[in-house]
């Protein structure tokens, strides 16, 4: 996907097209008032107050029609500068523009004129509205003014604009592809998860089939961790505010946490992360240097108060389950343990055929003594240790100043999904700070107490986000071991007793041998039931008729294919079990 904000040519053009859209809206809705209309990575948008009118598909069509008129008229676009007082007078009837103007420094303010429309704007813009003719309004939504839930709702219209119709057409094709890959659409078609505003925004619920996928991911990563000596625990979803004051999260992360709850005179909070709980588990008993490293893992439920505008299905929610672990090590073990984590990340990526990723070493900003723990020696030691491992492993990475956690540097592995923007999937963070805050110690070789170092790491990140990622990469065509339903039996004729008996016999046979199988006996035509299985991305479709009953065989077809293969049921089972055991994965 093109980045409209980063591309200077597209940035200017889309900025101008936002004004064309605003002009068209003003023609159709004279009462309209406008907040901001910036260019973003995905194109442009404008936040609009239409009073009692609402935006719907019919309104979008009418706005596009009016925009075409504005472009066809080919009005010159002029920039002029006026004083702040003149701007206040010009926009005196628009409270949104007045709010913007009041926030500006004294001095001249730029406005842009195009025909009968004038807007407050820094620019730059193209010089004529006719240059904006290759546009498309792509979506609309309701948003809170200034992103504050305490404010009223405005209507946001998104669009894109290109220099040529060919570029626009190509982009619209990509948008359609993105819609087909959107994990929210796939999740609905496959009955994986749901959400409801009565439960709460950003609080998705996994349905039986979605939870099956979730459990398979959990089993997969926990098995890999157990082989490496991880010890799995379970800790509560809440903690006292004092716990998070001790860890420093209350000072550094409070804005991302849910409000505290008062219970019997004590303040509790939903946890945003699991480190404090795991620190307390380590502190539960005395440790010797011979015990280290100790690797504590958990599939943990976490809660973060994400802004409503950033919520996106199971990719980004206010509740999620983290594939979390904390490694308690001696200073001498830092490099070997960090190296093992990096190997685990890329071994996992190999299993899932994840190849499009970028490694980022996130470092502190030495000048920011407020955000970051103020210990230069600690930071230099930690950052150099991570650099050395990455260099020794020959891993390409970039460094980003000011992106570290408040307690230490980290390695983020960012993926570029099939749709949308890059985000972090896996992370490993080095921490000299938290063990000191919790007074964690171990008895060293010389009999003295020493403070361990902690590696925070998440391989799959959150299971929710990881599931969203693979759903979009595969368009829902999950590998057999991960598919919620691995095979579906469809008897050709539901009213045939002998056929129904064989169908249920096969159902029991496969189920008893560990295959996730179901039967579709609905009173629908065969073609309808086959199409339903295709939509739900069932990997193996079993079509049974009289011949299969007579021969004790299975006729199956793979998802997306028309060819049917007939084999003995024992051979079919062996084929499925082999594919599951080898964890054959998908091709992107």
Language-model region placement:
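NTP/phosphate- and nucleic-acid-binding module
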Residues: 1-35, 39-41, 47-588
């Amino acid at each position: 996907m093109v980045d409209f904000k980063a591309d200077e040519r597209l940035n200017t053009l889309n900025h101008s097209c936002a004004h064309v859209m605003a002009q068209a809206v003003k023609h159709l809705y004279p009462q309209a008032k406008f907040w901001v209309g910036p260019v973003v990575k995905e194109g442009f948008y404008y936040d609009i107050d239409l009073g009692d009118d609402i935006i719907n598909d019919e309104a979008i069509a009418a706005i596009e029609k009016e925009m075409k008129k504005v472009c066809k008229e080919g009005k010159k676009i002029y920039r002029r500068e006026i004083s702040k007082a003149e701007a206040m007078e010009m926009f005196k009837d628009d409270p949104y523009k007045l709010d913007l103007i009041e926030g500006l420094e004294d001095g001249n303010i730029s406005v842009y004129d195009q025909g009968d429309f004038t807007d407050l704007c820094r620019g730059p813009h193209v010089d004529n509205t006719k240059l904006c003719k290759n546009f498309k309004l792509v979506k609309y939504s309701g948003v809170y003014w200034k992103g504050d839930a305490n404010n009223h709702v405005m209507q946001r219209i998104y669009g894109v604009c290109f220099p040529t119709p060919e570029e626009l057409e190509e982009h619209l094709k990509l948008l359609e592809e993105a819609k087909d890959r959107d994990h929210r659409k796939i999740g609905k078609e496959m009955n994986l998860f749901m959400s409801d505003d009565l439960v709460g925004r950003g609080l998705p619920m996994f349905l039986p089939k979605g939870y099956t996928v979730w459990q398979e991911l959990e089993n997969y990563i926990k098995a890999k961790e157990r082989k490496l000596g991880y010890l799995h625990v379970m800790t509560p979803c809440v903690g006292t505010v004092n716990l998070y004051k001790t860890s420093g999260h209350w000072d550094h992360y409070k804005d991302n946490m849910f409000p505290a709850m008062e219970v019997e005179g004590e303040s509790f909070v939903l946890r945003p992360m699991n480190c404090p709980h795991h620190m307390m588990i380590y502190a539960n008993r005395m440790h010797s240097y011979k015990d280290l490293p100790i690797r504590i893992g958990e599939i943990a439920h976490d809660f973060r108060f994400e802004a409503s505008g950033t919520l996106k299905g199971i990719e980004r929610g206010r509740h999620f389950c983290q594939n979390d672990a904390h490694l308690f090590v001696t200073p001498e073990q830092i490099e070997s343990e960090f190296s093992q984590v990096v190997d685990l990340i890329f071994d996992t990526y190999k299993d899932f055929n994840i190849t499009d990723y970028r490694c980022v070493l996130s470092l502190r900003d030495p000048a920011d003594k407020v955000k970051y723990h103020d210990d230069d020696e600690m930071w230099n030691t930690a950052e150099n240790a991570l650099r050395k491992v990455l260099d020794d492993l020959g891993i390409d990475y970039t460094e980003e100043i000011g992106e570290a956690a408040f307690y230490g540097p980290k390695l983020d592995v960012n993926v570029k999904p099939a749709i949308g923007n890059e985000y972090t999937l896996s992370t490993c963070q080095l921490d000299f700070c938290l063990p000191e805050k919790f007074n964690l110690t171990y008895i060293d070789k010389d009999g003295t107490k020493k403070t361990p170092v902690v590696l925070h790491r998440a391989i799959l990140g959150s299971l929710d986000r990881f599931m969203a990622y693979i759903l979009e990469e595969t368009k829902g065509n999950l590998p057999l071991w991960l598919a919620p339903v691995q095979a579906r039996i469809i008897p050709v004729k539901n009213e045939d007793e002998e056929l129904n008996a064989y169908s249920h016999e096969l159902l029991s046979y496969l189920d008893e041998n560990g295959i996730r199988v179901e039967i579709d006996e609905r009173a629908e035509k065969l073609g309808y039931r086959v199409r339903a299985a295709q939509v739900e991305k069932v990997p193996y479709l079993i079509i049974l008729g009289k011949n299969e009953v007579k021969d004790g065989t299975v006729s199956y077809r793979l998802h997306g294919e028309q060819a049917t293969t007939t084999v003995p049921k024992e051979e079919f089972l062996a084929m499925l079990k082999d594919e599951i055991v080898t964890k054959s994965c998908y091709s992107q």
